Amino acid sequence: DKNEAPAEGAPPADAGAASTDGPTYLLVPMRGVIGEDVLADGLVSVIAFAKRSGVKHIVLEIDSPGGLASEGRRIGEIMRDARKEVTFTAYVKSALSAAVIPAISSHRIFYEPEAQIGAAVAYRWVPETGAAEVDEKFLSALAATMAAMAESSGLNGDIVRAMVIPRLAVYAWSTAGGDVVVSAESPPAGAKDARTVDDAKGVLTLTARQASDLRFGELVGEAGIDGLGERVDAPGWRLYSNYGETAMRRASSVQEEAQQARDRFESVASTLGALVRRAVSEDPHGRVKLYYEA
């Protein structure tokens, strides 16, 4: 079954299909919250399956409001380590907050017409106040990490920094040759088409059209994912199997079950603690012996 991973060391399902029937890809749905619905462990399984099956392309379908920055960074690191063996293509519907990371870690980004990307500012929970606050040091480190990820994919690092750090201005202008320059530095005097991309009043979010105009990815054509093969040097590519969806769903299910087990443990521990405290209060000198039967 091509939707299930072959055993380690065993011949992959449909081995050789990519070489005889043209290029193939695996589709990885990244829908929902990073760290809950979208987990790095699922992507690890998909990459391993792709390598064993001879699949060279992985398409990340991103439609996420964000989530845990730590899980997003782990996803980015996994992609970085595999990018010489697998080509990642981001198909973006919405990539906000931590969901920006898998997009900028891909070799290419393509946007649906109504897509958006950005707003990657991170907050930390402060138990003393019960509020979420911006941690400037963490943001600075995260911005540097994400900018490096973007630049390794040929994207502009200043755009990413503006998505992470509030109050960071970004400008754009055109050269005499028609190239678009995007920078945190002010445009030179007389620069052509000079404009402010982000006015430093908040974190940057780009529409699909804005991102395309700034060379921060490309717009998807009417053919959608099926039509992207021509643009990523895999003409006529086809979906190899549904294993990508299977793996991501399985990883999320495992985490949910683990969380339920932790919740049950905490509930039992709380109940036992209350019973012990009651027993101690009613028998402070420990005269009553307690026996437990298996």
What are these regions (language model features)?
Residues 126-257:
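Charged, glycine-interspersed solvent-exposed loop segments at helix/strand-loop junctions
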Residues 36-56:
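A short, well-ordered alpha-helical element
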Residues 64-75, 79-127, 134-138, 142-145, ...:
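Glycine-rich beta-to-alpha active-site loop
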Residues 19-41:
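STAS-typified acidic loop motif
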Residues 33-41, 66-73, 94-97, 111, ...:
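Soluble non-cytosolic domains of exported or imported proteins
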Residues 230-292:
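Charged, amphipathic alpha-helical linkers/stalks
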Residues 28, 43, 60, 103, ...:
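Terminal peptide-recognition signature
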Residues 1-24:
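Compositionally biased, proline/threonine/alanine/serine-rich low-complexity intrinsically disordered stretches
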